Amino acid sequence: MQKYISEARLLLALAIPVILAQIAQTAMGFVDTVMAGGYSATDMAAVAIGTSIWLPAILFGHGLLLALTPVIAQLNGSGRRERIAHQVRQGFWLAGFVSVLIMLVLWNAGYIIRSMENIDPALADKAVGYLRALLWGAPGYLFFQVARNQCEGLAKTKPGMVMGFIGLLVNIPVNYIFIYGHFGMPELGGVGCGVATAAVYWVMFLAMVSYIKRARSMRDIRNEKGTAKPDPAVMKRLIQLGLPIALALFFEVTLFAVVALLVSPLGIVDVAGHQIALNFSSLMFVLPMSLAAAVTIRVGYRLGQGSTLDAQTAARTGLMVGVCMATLTAIFTVSLREQIALLYNDNPEVVTLAAHLMLLAAVYQISDSIQVIGSGILRGYKDTRSIFYITFTAYWVLGLPSGYILALTDLVVEPMGPAGFWIGFIIGLTSAAIMMMLRMRFLQRMPSAIILQRASR
């Protein structure tokens, strides 16, 4: 029992800074929306449209680079720290190549925006302008993620938290300068949010690099002198590990986007209630997601040390802590769901629907926690391909079709509206949790030699 308590303390020490970093990142998006809304409703809508395209694109690159964390954790645990610098340098090369692709996609996203039905031309122009300003921050964001993954792979999660809050503090005044045109800068409105956010990502990257160069704990990890050339073998391995994670993230983000589109014809009350419940459940999701990042680090580190039993302990502890957290957040959600909904909107119909949907959200919080921590465990074992297959099957084969049938058709029951989609979420997330656990048990029952061989690839 003592080993589980000790492991839980280590996991929470790693996870809490990740939680705070995620809060800072979420707050940046909130600040952009509020400050753009203060300028005009059109500018706020433009930022919202631009963000809906930016997020799937940049999260694809983010997911690809998440492969670095278990790789570095495993090298650190096995005492092969001299190989870490080369992996990081190749991560920077990969981030550079991916950022070019993302920038090309975002530059041409205007065709998608302008093809939207009944969109106001002025709104479309502002959304395109916002994206074309923001895309210059894509390399800065991805380079920052490489540096952050280096730190987190070495079990240093506090730097990412500090840089997140630095970014938030810089974002507010820079937003103000470019939105309203102060200190000789042009008045750009919502487009100024894109300029500010792009600049902030570069500031965060440079601040993180400055920390890494000065950190005593990383003195033995230095990038090669001069410019290291791309190493196709290392980059191929990072892509093999990272691409399934990237695709899983992409399909998860697009699932919620598709559901939002399917809900939109149902009316303002249904859309508002759905959005409130989704926004709140997304805030609660930060807790298990951050714990999953910590579990990846611990499992990778223990496998690097050659201890499959300690890796199992880290995995089980992460799941137990995650279930306890999810139980508490579910009780909190059920108890205060109406009061929470009132913070967003005071329309009685909207509040009633949002409170009902939050009840369904409370039901799936334990499943959601298990599936996301299970994903973190599998990343630690470098078993990322199964994450993609499980996520795709659970969300797009089981969750979305069942939600569609319940919400919009009378094949099973009378059309349930948004609640049908939320029952679909429960089906999808519970299926994902079950499949993640089955895969984890399958891996852990392999002979230790095979597990360690797979982890050292």
From Swiss-Prot:
Entry keyword set: Antiport, Cell inner membrane, Cell membrane, Ion transport, Membrane, Sodium, Sodium transport, Transmembrane, Transmembrane helix, Transport
GO CC annotation terms, alphabetical: plasma membrane
Entry's Gene Ontology BP terms: sodium ion transport; xenobiotic transmembrane transport
Ranges of the Periplasmic topological domain: 32-52, 114-126, 181-188, 264-275, 335-349, 408-417
InterPro entries the record matches: MATE_fam, MATE_MdtK, MdtK-like, Multidrug-R_MdtK
UniProt-recorded name of the protein: Multidrug resistance protein MdtK
Annotated localization: Cell inner membrane
Gene Ontology molecular function, alphabetical: antiporter activity; xenobiotic transmembrane transporter activity
Protein purpose: Multidrug efflux pump that functions probably as a Na(+)/drug antiporter.
Entry's transmembrane regions: 11-31, 53-73, 93-113, 127-147, 160-180, 189-209, 243-263, 276-296, 314-334, 350-370, 387-407, 418-438
Family per similarity comment: Belongs to the multi antimicrobial extrusion (MATE) (TC 2.A.66.1) family. MdtK subfamily.
Record Pfam families: MatE
Gene transcribed to yield this protein: mdtK
Membrane topology: Multi-pass membrane protein
Residue ranges annotated as Cytoplasmic topological domain: 1-10, 74-92, 148-159, 210-242, 297-313, 371-386, 439-457
Higher taxonomy: Bacteria, Pseudomonadati, Pseudomonadota, Gammaproteobacteria, Enterobacterales
